[in-house]
Amino acid sequence: ICIVDTPGQMELFAFRNIGAQIAQELTDAEKGVIYIFDGLQCKDPLNYVMNMFLASAINTKFFLPQYHLISKTDLLSEAELEEMMRWSEDPYALEESIDAKLTGMNRSMSQEMMEIIGRIGMDFDPLPVSSANNEGFADLYSKLMLTFTDGGKFTP
C-alpha cells in the first residue's frame, strides 16, 4: 500500500490538473482516495456538510474508490462521535441537526449542499480513526483489502 498525504494541499492536489496526473502516474497498481473529515471541525453540522460536499467534488474529479475517515476521535466526546456517526447513517438526523443548530445563510447553504450531495448519490460511511490509539486502522485495512484484493492480502 502506498498512501500519499497532502496536508494543507487539498486545493492544489484535488482541484488542479497536476493532482490527477500525480494520481495516475504514481503507480500502475490500483488506486483510491482517502478523504479525512477532521473530527474536531466536523462536530459542527455546517463543517460536516461542507466536508461531504468537498469529498463529493473530489470523487467526481478522480472517479476512484473513495474512503472517508473521521480523524482525531480520541479528542472527541463519545456523544460527539456518536452524533457524527448518526449523521453518516441517517441523512434525516443530519438535517435535524442543521435545523436545530444553524441559522440564516449557514442553514440554507447546508440544506442546499445536502440536496446536491443527495442528487449525486454519494454514500458516506466514515470510519472513526485515531492515530493516538490506532482506533479504526484495522477496519480501514479491511476495506482496502476488500476493494483492491477481493479480500485477499496485499502483496508487494
What are these regions (language model features)?
Residues 11-17, 44-47, 79-80:
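Conserved ATPase-coupling elements of RecA-like P-loop NTPase cores
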